Design a protein with these regions (language model features):
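N-terminal export leaders
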Residues: 3-7
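Short, glycine-/small- and polar/acidic-enriched structural segments
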Residues: 27-177, 181-187, 201-206, 211-212
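Pocket-lining segment of extracytoplasmic ligand-binding domains
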Residues: 92, 170-261
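Ligand-binding clefts/hinges and TM-proximal coupling segments of bilobed small-molecule sensing domains
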Residues: 142-158, 238-270, 312-314, 323-329
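Secondary-structure end/capping motifs
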Residues: 226-307
Length: 336
């Protein structure tokens, strides 16, 4: 009995220590609300779910609630209002919000390269065939609108030469029904659409058309970062760790993507292969100065930011938070 008591007592002390320090107790984790721009997520957006499912968030001391929305603009608005602690949105839209003094900054860009395609119906064979066609967008200034106008500009087609048609976030049904002639689809959406209608085809891969404009950027409110810097350092570090996990653990990543993106495993696997081949996901902070400045300048060029309101790199990026977050994580060469 005496020997058993000696064994149990240290165990109880250790258990109490774990509760005191937070190890092994979810009560000690820092709560954080994170917004994702699509419902359900696409494969490219799966990073926070990977961080949650693999325990990376917990390792960093975070208890993250992931909420989904019907577009990146809604995420940005909820971060600005304070309803969300952080979330992911289009890098260009974030630049516009920063120019309007919204009080936000970028933490990391888990997917700095576009993961989208301009998928078109069979009546469009070449870029000039876009003239007079119905271009599917969610709302003016939204992700699909920005990318569609980007493609038109590259092809020398004026906005007034096409018809912009507002649709819901789910682009595939109206494309299949002929309500629109084009849709901005992520690679997994494109594969699903082509299985239903083989005549649909990809006119543009945006990671090739515009490799320097930032795509999926995680933002947070400046006031919240100033009040709780450690919380946001943990988030940034966890997301970078999740990206690195994904590059070296295909099977688990595909499993998580299939579960949360509600995809057949083979489509999730095909999307994974396309995204990793194109290096769409970053392995560092993803916020290279040249790409941040390119994104800002692009928004000035298209008239979404007035020249006298143009933000600087330092206005866009939460530099001190990122620097502290990534201490001890060696930079991966040849990746953003």
């Amino acid at each position: 009995m005496h020997r058993r008591s000696l064994v149990v007592l240290p165990a109880l002390l250790l258990a109490g220590l774990a509760l005191w320090t937070g190890r092994g107790s979810t009560q000690q984790l820092i709560k954080l609300k994170f917004g994702n721009p699509t419902t359900p997520p696409n494969t490219v957006h799966i990073i926070p779910w990977v961080a949650k499912e693999t325990g990376i968030f917990a390792e960093e001391g975070l208890d993250v609630e992931i909420l989904t929305f019907e577009g990146g603009l809604y995420v940005i608005r909820n971060v600005v209002s304070g309803a969300l602690d952080a979330g992911g949105g289009p890098g260009a839209s974030i630049a516009v919000s920063i120019a309007r003094k919204a009080g936000i900054k970028a933490l990391v860009s888990p997917a700095p390269r576009f993961a989208s395609t301009l998928t078109v119906r069979s009546n469009i064979k070449k870029p000039e065939d876009l003239k007079g066609k119905k271009i599917g967008i969610q709302e003016v200034g939204g992700f699909a609108d920005i990318l569609s106008r980007m493609a038109l500009r590259k092809f020398g087609i004026k906005p007034e030469e096409v018809n912009f048609v507002p649709i819901a976030s789910a682009d595939v049904p109206p494309l299949l029904a002929g309500a629109i002639d084009t849709a901005i689809l992520h690679v997994d959406q494109m594969e699903i659409a082509r299985r239903k209608e083989p005549s649909l085809h990809t006119l543009v891969k945006f990671w090739e058309l515009e490799p320097n404009q930032l795509f999926y950027v995680v933002l947070a409110q400046e006031k919240k970062m100033a009040a709780e810097p450690v919380k946001f350092q943990k988030l940034a570090r966890a997301l970078v760790k999740a990206n690195r996990f994904m590059y070296t653990n295909k099977a688990k990543t595909v499993e998580i993507a299939a579960k949360y993106a509600q995809l057949p495993p083979d489509i999730a696997a095909a999307a994974y292969d396309e995204l990793t081949r194109a290096k769409v996901w970053s392995q560092n902070d993803g916020l290279r100065r040249d790409k941040v400045e390119y994104t800002i300048n692009r928004m000035v060029q298209v008239g979404n930011i007035k020249p006298d309101a143009k933000p600087k790199y330092e206005d866009y990026v939460a530099g001190p938070i990122i620097e502290e977050a990534l201490k001890g994580l060696p930079r991966i060469p040849d990746f953003d």
